[in-house]
Every structure is written in structure tokens, then in C-alpha cells.
Curated annotation (Swiss-Prot):
UniProt source species: Phocaeicola vulgatus (strain ATCC 8482 / DSM 1447 / JCM 5826 / CCUG 4940 / NBRC 14291 / NCTC 11154)
Protein name: Bifunctional protein FolD
Catalytic activity: (6R)-5,10-methylene-5,6,7,8-tetrahydrofolate + NADP(+) = (6R)-5,10-methenyltetrahydrofolate + NADPH; (6R)-5,10-methenyltetrahydrofolate + H2O = (6R)-10-formyltetrahydrofolate + H(+)
Keyword Oxidoreductase included in the entry's annotation: yes
Family designation: Belongs to the tetrahydrofolate dehydrogenase/cyclohydrolase family.
Database matches in PANTHER family: C-1-TETRAHYDROFOLATE SYNTHASE, CYTOPLASMIC, C-1-TETRAHYDROFOLATE SYNTHASE, CYTOPLASMIC-RELATED
Length: 293
């Protein structure tokens, strides 16, 4: 069993980005600039945004954090999005999800200029990704592809089961694992809460990508010997022994599943750090105008 160390790989990628940015700046070019909008005080969102700002620092990017209270109106938020669309200094920006109930996430996503949509959530980026055109690929699936690549994990002709069908992970992940490229060329099955033979599908899978948000859902009896298991779940489970009062728990029952795997990602320290690094990669592409002029 080999542990896929997302933390170590993410540090490596950040150093690669920082070196490229240093080269751009040395030639008189502009530092990539990422802006983030944070609404309210959701614990998970606070943690993620802080990590994104810190990653920008390491990569040599300029970053801006724009904060609103949870009672901000949809109109006020959309006005800020339009302002960032027009701001030539901002290369890419994100609106941290989830948003309060009174704001339509879809409306916000569609208002973002797709050329600055470094989260890869805009329908234009999603559509381009699904037909294999250059675009900003959403961060978590992109991070998983990077891990498969860096560990030289074989995907061609492999049976890959994606657990979960969210727009953020499940659907794009299935599309990417089917693409005519490496990593890809896999035979993909998507399972979800309504699937009938989920356990049987998992037992036959060479690669399982678990993105359900259900702690410890994948158990040893669901995984065949030598499988590759990628755990996208990060649920905060109360834990009195931890200073924060909770521990991050994946969708995979790690201790019992790991011995059967050829490769497995831990939680934390697996997919999470790669998600942030993918956002940095997209921001660098935006700064270089590599995808959209």
C-alpha cells in the first residue's frame, strides 16, 4: 500500500508555480492576482479561504480578500462580481461557497466572467471541459488528476467508480476520467444515493473516487485487493480530543480499507491540499492569458 501524499505534492507544485512567477516578474511581467469573496462566517469556508490566501503568498501571487456579512443582499454581491469582472488588475476570482440561502449560487456563478472563473464553475467552462476544449477545470477534479499523474497511476482501460454526482466533483470527475488522454481513458461508472448495486460496482472497481460527503461510507468489503482509492470526503465530525472540537473525516474507512489498496489518499492531507493548488494553477493560467485572451 502506498499513501498518496497530497500535502507533499501540493508543496512541490507551489514551488514550481513560484519559480515560474519569479521568472515572469523578472522579465517585467505582472504578478497573477487572485481575489476571493467570502460571505458570512462559515467555519469551513473561513479555513479554506485562509489557506487560499496563504497559498497565493507562497506562489508569489497578489491576493485580495473581500468580506461581506451573511445578510448581504444578492444585488450587492452581484454588483461586486461585475466590478471584479471589469477590474483589469484582477486575473481571476472566486466566490467561496456555500452562500446564504437568500442568494442564488447559480446566479452568482453565471455572473462571473468565465475568463476569470478560476474555480471552473461557470457553465462555459463546464461545457468546454466536457467536450475536451481548453478551459479552467474545477479545482478538486483537477487536483485528483494531478495526483494520478504524479504517482504514475495507470488509468487506461481501468474500471473507475465515481461515488457522488455533484456538479463540483462527481460529474466533472466522471467526464475527465473518460477523456481521450492521460489520466483518463477509463471505463467510468457513476454511483449515487439512488444506485441499486453500489457495493457490487465498487467491488469490481480498479479505481474508486469517493465524493459523497458521508463519513466512513466505503468499507473494506467494498474494495478489491490492489484498488486505487481517492477519498474526496471532508466531513467535520465532533471530537472532544481535538483542540478545534472536531476531526476531518473522509468518505473511506481508512484504517480497514488502506491495507487492501495499491494507493490511497488520507484525509486530511490527500485531496484537500491539491484542490487549493489547482486553484493556484488556474490563476497562473489566467495571469498568463494562456486559455482565454
Amino acid at each position: 500500500m502506498q499513501l498518496i501524499d497530497g500535502k507533499a505534492i501540493s508543496e512541490l507544485v507551489k514551488q514550481e508555480i513560484a519559480a515560474e512567477v519569479a521568472g515572469i516578474v523578472a522579465k517585467g511581467g505582472k504578478r497573477p492576482h487572485l481575489a476571493a469573496i467570502l460571505v458570512g462566517h462559515d467555519g469551513g469556508s473561513e479555513t479554506y479561504v485562509a489557506a487560499k490566501v496563504k497559498a497565493c503568498e507562497v506562489c508569489g501571487f497578489k491576493s485580495s480578500l473581500i468580506r461581506y456579512e451573511a445578510d448581504v443582499t444578492e444585488e450587492e454581491l452581484l454588483a461586486k462580481v461585475r466590478e471584479l469582472n471589469e477590474d483589469a488588475d484582477v486575473d481571476g476570482f472566486i466566490v467561496q461557497l456555500p452562500l446564504p440561502k437568500h442568494i442564488s449560487e447559480q446566479k452568482v456563478i453565471e455572473t462571473i466572467d468565465y475568463r476569470k472563473d478560476v474555480d471552473g464553475f461557470h457553465p462555459i467552462n463546464v461545457g468546454r471541459m466536457s467536450i475536451g476544449l481548453p478551459c479552467y477545470v474545477s479545482a478538486t477534479p483537477n487536483g485528483i488528476l494531478e495526483l494520478l499523474k504524479r504517482y504514475h497511476i495507470e488509468t487506461q482501460g481501468k474500471k473507475c467508480v465515481v461515488l457522488g454526482r455533484s456538479n463540483i466533483v462527481g460529474k466533472p470527475m466522471a467526464s475527465l476520467m473518460m477523456q481521450k488522454a492521460y489520466p483518463g481513458d477509463a471505463t467510468v461508472t457513476v454511483c449515487h444515493s439512488r444506485s441499486k448495486d453500489l457495493v457490487k460496482e465498487c467491488q469490481e472497481a480498479d479505481i474508486i473516487i469517493a465524493a459523497l460527503g458521508q463519513p466512513n461510507f466505503v468499507k473494506a468489503e467494498m474494495v478489491k485487493e490492489g484498488a486505487v482509492v481517492i477519498d474526496v470526503g471532508t466531513t467535520r465530525v465532533p471530537d472532544a480530543t481535538k483542540k478545534s472540537g472536531f476531526k476531518l473525516t473522509g468518505d473511506v474507512k481508512f484504517d480497514e480499507v488502506a491495507p487492501k489498496c495499491s494507493y490511497i489518499t488520507p484525509v486530511p492531507g490527500g485531496v484537500g491540499p491539491m484542490t487549493i493548488v489547482s486553484l493556484m494553477k488556474n490563476t497562473l493560467l489566467a495571469g498568463k492569458k494562456a486559455i482565454y485572451k
